[in-house]
């Protein structure tokens, strides 16, 4: 069975209550359930993890080598973490970077990501729909064995 990872970084455990005008009112658990539902239709396993600790995110990712795809919302670590970037490169799992808010319409320091240039794609500003679109893309990617141009 194919496996997709859903990895969420710092403060995303507060979704639903933290700045809902920016991040919406959907909780992380609800997002995880929605993503898992998209994947399960295609008999793809969804493994989820969230931590506020960069080291825990890296350690968990190291244990997931061999997964078929990664959905990554690094949160604020997108703008600061060379360590998590190196871990993503090291495990050699194709991934999409996801942000609930449009980071390019926010503070200047949020405009740079250490992940965008190594991701197969990036989604920002689409709220929960961004996660679902990323999950749908992961399904297509897995079904095409990485040959995404055949479905375009």
Give the label of every model feature segment:
Residues 1-4:
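Extreme N-terminal starter segment of soluble prokaryotic enzymes
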Residues 48, 105-152:
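Short, glycine-/small-residue-rich phosphate/pyrophosphate-handling segment
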Residues 15-29:
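Glycine- and acidic-residue-enriched helix-capping/strand-helix junction motifs
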Residues 52-91:
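N-terminal small/polar loop signature for handling phosphorylated ligands or for N-terminal nucleophile
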Residues 10-12, 75-78, 101-103:
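Short glycine-rich anion-binding loops that position phosphate/pyrophosphate groups of nucleotides
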């Amino acid at each position: 069975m194919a496996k997709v990872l859903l990895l969420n970084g710092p403060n995303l455990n507060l979704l639903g209550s933290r700045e809902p005008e920016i991040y919406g009112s959907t909780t992380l658990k609800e997002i995880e359930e929605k993503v898992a539902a998209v994947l399960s239709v295609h008999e793809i396993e969804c493994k989820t993890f969230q931590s506020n600790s960069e080291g825990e995110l890296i350690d968990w990712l190291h244990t997931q080598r061999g997964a078929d795809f990664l959905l990554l919302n690094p949160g604020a670590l997108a703008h600061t973490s060379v360590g998590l970037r190196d871990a993503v490169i090291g495990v050699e799992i194709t991934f999409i970077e996801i942000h609930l808010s449009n980071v390019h319409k926010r503070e200047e320091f949020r405009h740079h990501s250490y992940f965008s240039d190594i991701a197969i794609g990036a989604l920002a500003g689409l709220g929960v729909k961004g996660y679902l679109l990323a999950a749908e893309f992961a399904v297509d990617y897995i079904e095409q064995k990485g040959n995404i141009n055949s479905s375009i």
